């Protein structure tokens, strides 16, 4: 397809309330609710009542952290809003370190999701044993590249896929929830008695209760992902709050009903002994459909993989726009999609799939994101003090900021204190290793002549161009 020279190429504001709500729901609900929702129950000392209360409490905590991110996305309504926010609050070096972390954890996330998707997609064909590694990796690579192609076709191509995936995911969870309620009303006496005596079991110690809260809090992660797409949302100051107050209560209700359904059919002991709770539940309720559960989980993970590629490619695009990655990463194709950024992230994710040991090392970087959450809270307070007249269509309730900072700081300190490992030192060194790239290439602006020639060649090869920055800024200013 030839590129129309009269056509303006830039990231457009074309995503509305329905797409944004789908995006949030897909990001929050992963495979955990299908596979292993037993962590909260285990650390609640098998106290059913306490475990359900923990889920409600975690939903409230998730809402506070998501609303903190909402202030960032609404105040800075740009694509990858948190990058602009950190750059304004703490300077370009801190923003680069955030990018530096994302460049390596992003492909690790893609590889982990693709491998898990492949595992559940291929396992039904090996009922009596574990699936071989080679077919699993081949399927993971195929799924990742299919998702990459879909992302390169622009957000319009993703809209229908997200809608289908969200409907399928919510349909499965609704079936589990409603079936559980039906069995609770018409079921045996022991099912009803188990919930009537929900608080009769031993009350957990405070340390175990905190661990249960962490387990549940992770299940709600992903609520702040809209900051990646704030620059492509229509009227972000209105759309973002509406999406949050639709998606999070809906996810909370579904999580509670699904757990209630599991506990109606399975005893706490049976739930803890199961590696795939949804599979065990289906085997008890409708044995004929047991084979379908792995495919349902795969469909759920496929939608998560789509949104993950979408997010990581936008990070590379914005960093390039701000001179912290090569100019090539900010080029767009005729579908207004950052094709090279998508290609880069999918390629790095493919390498991580082949070298699976790398994923274990990359997983140690995840706790670093809690540091960024703490810095974001500090940044919000800093801007409120230094720039009180900055236009803020929305301001989060101040106590929510301190609650979010306390939870995120705990997620950093507790692993270090409870089970210190040498790998955390490696993560710290990796974190500072960004200096080796920042100083010569960004601070001193070292230019590589051969890379400029490569940029011109790839622009012609892939039919891509530098975005019309003036039009993109107009779209941002209009918001």
UniProtKB/Swiss-Prot annotation:
Q: Name one GO molecular function term.
A: L-amino acid transmembrane transporter activity
Q: Which InterPro entries match?
A: AA/rel_permease1, AminoAcid_Transporter
Please report the record's description of how this protein sits within the membrane.
Multi-pass membrane protein
Q: What's any GO biological process attached to this entry?
A: amino acid transmembrane transport
- The chain's Extracellular topological domains, given as residue ranges, are 36-47, 111-129, 187-208, 264-289, 360, 418-423
Q: Where in the cell is it found?
A: Apical cell membrane
User: Where are the membrane-spanning stretches?
Assistant: 15-35, 48-68, 90-110, 130-150, 166-186, 209-229, 243-263, 290-310, 339-359, 361-381, 397-417, 424-444
What this protein catalyses is: L-cystine(out) + L-aspartate(in) = L-cystine(in) + L-aspartate(out); L-cystine(out) = L-cystine(in); L-aspartate(in) + L-glutamate(out) = L-aspartate(out) + L-glutamate(in); L-aspartate(in) + L-glutamine(out) = L-aspartate(out) + L-glutamine(in)
Cite the ranges annotated as topological domain Cytoplasmic.
1-14, 69-89, 151-165, 230-242, 311-338, 382-396, 445-479
User: Which controlled-vocabulary keywords does the entry list?
Assistant: Amino-acid transport, Antiport, Cell membrane, Disulfide bond, Membrane, Transmembrane, Transmembrane helix, Transport
**Electron transport as a keyword?**
no
Give the protein's function: Associates with SLC3A1/rBAT to form a functional heterodimeric complex that transports anionic and neutral amino acids across the apical plasma membrane of renal epithelium. Preferentially mediates exchange transport, but can also operate via facilitated diffusion. May act as a major transporter for L-cystine in late proximal tubules, ensuring its reabsorption from the luminal fluid in exchange for cytosolic L-glutamate or L-aspartate.
Q: Which family does it belong to?
A: Belongs to the amino acid-polyamine-organocation (APC) superfamily.
PANTHER family on file: AMINO ACID TRANSPORTER, SOLUTE CARRIER FAMILY 7 MEMBER 13
Annotated protein name in UniProt: Solute carrier family 7 member 13
Identify the species of origin: Rattus norvegicus
The organism that produces this protein has a lineage beginning with: Eukaryota, Metazoa, Chordata, Craniata, Vertebrata
């Amino acid at each position: 397809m030839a590129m129309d020279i009269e056509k303006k190429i830039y990231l457009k504001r074309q995503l509305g309330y329905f797409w944004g709500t789908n995006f949030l729901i897909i990001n929050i609900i992963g495979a955990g609710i299908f596979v292993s929702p037993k962590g909260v129950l285990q650390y609640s000392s098998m106290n059913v009542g306490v475990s359900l209360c923990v889920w409600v409490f975690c939903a409230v905590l998730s809402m506070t952290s998501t609303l903190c991110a909402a202030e960032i996305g609404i105040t800075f309504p740009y694509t990858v809003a948190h990058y602009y926010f950190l750059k304004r609050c703490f300077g370009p070096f801190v923003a680069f370190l955030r990018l530096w972390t994302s460049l390596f954890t992003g492909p690790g996330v893609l590889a982990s999701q693709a491998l898990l998707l492949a595992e559940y997609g291929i396992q039904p064909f090996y009922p009596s044993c574990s699936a071989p590694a080679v077919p699993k990796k081949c399927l993971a690579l195929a799924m990742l590249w299919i998702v990459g192609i879909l992302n390169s076709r622009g957000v319009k191509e993703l809209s229908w896929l997200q809608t289908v995936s969200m409907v399928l995911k919510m349909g499965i969870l609704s079936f589990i929830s409603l079936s559980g309620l039906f069995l609770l009303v018409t079921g045996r006496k022991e099912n009803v008695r188990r919930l009537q005596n929900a608080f009769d079991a031993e009350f957990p110690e405070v340390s175990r209760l905190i661990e249960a809260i962490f387990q549940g809090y992770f299940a709600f992660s992903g609520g702040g992902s809209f900051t990646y797409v704030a620059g492509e949302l229509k009227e972000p100051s209105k759309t973002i709050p509406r999406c949050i107050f639709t998606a999070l209560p809906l996810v909370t209700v579904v999580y509670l009903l699904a757990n209630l359904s599991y506990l109606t059919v399975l005893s706490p002991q049976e739930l803890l002994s199961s590696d795939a709770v949804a599979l065990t539940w289906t085997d008890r309720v409708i044995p004929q459909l047991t084979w379908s559960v792995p495919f349902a989980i795969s469909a759920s993970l496929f939608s998560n993989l789509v949104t993950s590629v979408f997010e990581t490619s936008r990070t590379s695009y914005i960093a390039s726009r701000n001179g912290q990655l090569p100019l090539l990463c900010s080029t767009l194709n005729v579908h207004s999609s950052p094709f090279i950024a998508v290609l880069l992230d999918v390629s790095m994710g493919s390498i991580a799939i082949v070298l699976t040991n790398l994923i274990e090392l990359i997983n140690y970087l995840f706790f670093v994101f809690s540091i960024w959450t703490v810095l974001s809270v500090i940044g919000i307070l800093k801007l409120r003090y230094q720039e009180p007249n900055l236009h803020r269509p929305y301001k989060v309730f101040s106590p929510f900021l301190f609650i979010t900072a306390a939870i995120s700081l705990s997620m950093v300190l507790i692993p270090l204190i409870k089970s210190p490992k040498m790998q955390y030192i490696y993560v710290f060194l990796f974190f500072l290793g960004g200096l080796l790239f920042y100083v010569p290439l960004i601070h001193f602006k070292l230019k590589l002549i051969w890379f400029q020639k490569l940029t011109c060649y790839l622009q012609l090869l892939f039919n891509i161009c530098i975005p019309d920055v003036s039009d993109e800024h107009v779209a941002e200013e209009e918001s």
